[in-house]
A protein has these predicted regions:
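Soluble small-group transferase modules, centered on the S-adenosyl donor enzyme superfamily
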Residues: 2-52, 62, 221-294
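The AdoMet/dcAdoMet-binding core of the Class I SAM-like
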Residues: 2-18, 63-213, 217, 240
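A general beta-strand register signal
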Residues: 56-57
Length: 294
């Protein structure tokens, strides 16, 4: 039996990325992988040979243990660093618990409300993916409720900050103007702000992002004490730059390299503001042929 090597069984998971219009295959180990069909959606955690554990919802990649820290640091800390008060924070979505984990790193947070519409998914993540939350669900400051985000934000409860960590915005089927209007109303009295995941930035296809920014711009035009900011960071497992939009009360908002010491330097250096001129649809990747006189 000398020289006999035991080989772990490797399977293949297929993802259809509707945003980029491509399919991807991931090799993974059956051990430490899990699958569930909830009343709301289908969820898979696969133990990838490269990305470690990966979370898919309805077949679309949401997060990997190898690089989720990039996304969640970029989503949470620029807003948190901006808020004058951090007493009461709301998360809409964030079922895996990593967003809550990052918010709870701030000692000034007294109360964190997390609202997700899928209780079965949250329980699934607690058991099969505790590496995402890293104990956040046991923090006494955290309360988890299971409601629709659009309905919950209408309750009129005030917060210092709101973090919208829902799946990529679908402007055709979801009422985003209503959600963002009510979200701003929930932070207006306290002069707070909100941040949202705005999806993939593709220079050759910016209409969806521009439409989303237009909603935010219109909100700020009717609430002059607030300003909006758009920034990106590269997330390797997403194969591109991810976009975030912040609406914050006039004052400090820094997303340049000097901001927020809580973010690791290697992540911070990749977070950049997205100028308006990079949203023009004429950017199509065609090489420029005009002469350069320099």
């Amino acid at each position: 039996m000398n020289g006999l090597t035991r080989v772990r069984s490797v399977l293949e998971f297929n993802e259809k990325d509707s945003d980029q219009g491509v399919e991807r295959n991931y090799l993974y180990y059956k051990s430490d992988s899990a699958h569930i069909v909830t009343e709301k959606q289908e969820a898979d955690i696969i133990n990838s040979t490269y990305w470690k554990k990966m979370l898919f919802l309805d077949g679309t990649l949401q997060s990997t243990l190898r690089d989720e820290v990039i996304y969640h640091n970029a989503l949470v800390h620029p807003l948190m660093d901006t808020l004058q008060s951090k007493d009461d924070i709301l998360i809409l979505g964030g079922g895996e618990g990593a967003t809550a984990r990052e918010v709870l790193r701030w000692s000034k947070v007294k109360s964190l409300m997390m609202v997700d519409y899928d209780k079965e998914l949250v329980e699934f993540m607690k058991y099969h993916g505790p590496e995402w939350s890293m104990g956040a669900f046991h923090d006494r400051r955290l309360t988890v409720m299971f409601h629709d985000a659009w309905a919950f934000i209408k309750t009129g409860i005030e917060y210092d900050g709101v973090i919208i960590d829902l799946t990529d915005p679908d402007l055709k089927t979801e009422r985003w103007p209503e959600l963002l209007k009510n979200t701003l109303a929930s932070v207006k009295t306290r002069k707070g702000g909100f941040v949202m995941n705005a999806g993939l930035y593709q220079p050759w296809s910016t209409k969806k992002l521009k439409d989303l920014i237009s909603i935010v711009k219109n909100l700020c035009s009717r609430n002059l004490e607030f300003r909006y900011y758009v920034y990106t960071t590269f997330v390797p497992s997403f194969n591109g730059e991810w976009t975030f939009i912040v609406v914050a009360h006039k004052g400090k908002f820094m997303v340049e390299p000097e901001f927020s010491d809580v973010i690791p330097a290697w992540i911070k250096r990749g977070i950049k503001m997205l100028p308006d001129e990079l949203l023009d649809e004429y950017i199509d990747g065609v090489p420029q042929t005009s002469p350069i006189h320099k």
